[in-house]
Amino acid sequence: MESLFIFAFGMMLSSASALSCIPCVPEECEDPGPCEYGKVLDPCQCCLICRKGPGEICGGPWNLQGVCAEGFACITLSGNPVMNLNGGGQEVGRCRKKY
């Protein structure tokens, strides 16, 4: 019984940090218009959104704050790259030129 409780609690924790996406209907996506730094699919992998440019906010959970343009990296205020593993890091950063 205790193992069932631990399993259920673990499932609650994992679902609390999951990204919920509605079913994708590409026809309902808004056109982002011209994007100076290119386009990328949104965090739900459905609609196109503009990539972020130099100095713009990026990262966060599932990269909800945006993805940097090609040749740029999302760098935290502490100077570390935002980790992008299984849904992105929790930290927000700014787009900086890769060297």
UniProtKB/Swiss-Prot annotation:
Its main location: secreted. One of its GO terms (cellular component) is extracellular region. Glycans are attached at residue 20. Residues 1-18 form the signal peptide. GO terms for biological process: innate immune response; regulation of cell growth; regulation of signal transduction. Gene3D superfamilies: 4.10.40.20. Expressed in hemocytes. Keywords: Disulfide bond, Glycoprotein, Immunity, Innate immunity, Secreted, Signal. Disulfide bonds join 21-44, 24-46, 29-47, 35-50, 58-74, 68-95. Does not reveal bactericidal activities against E.coli and S.aureus. This is Single insulin-like growth factor-binding domain protein-2.
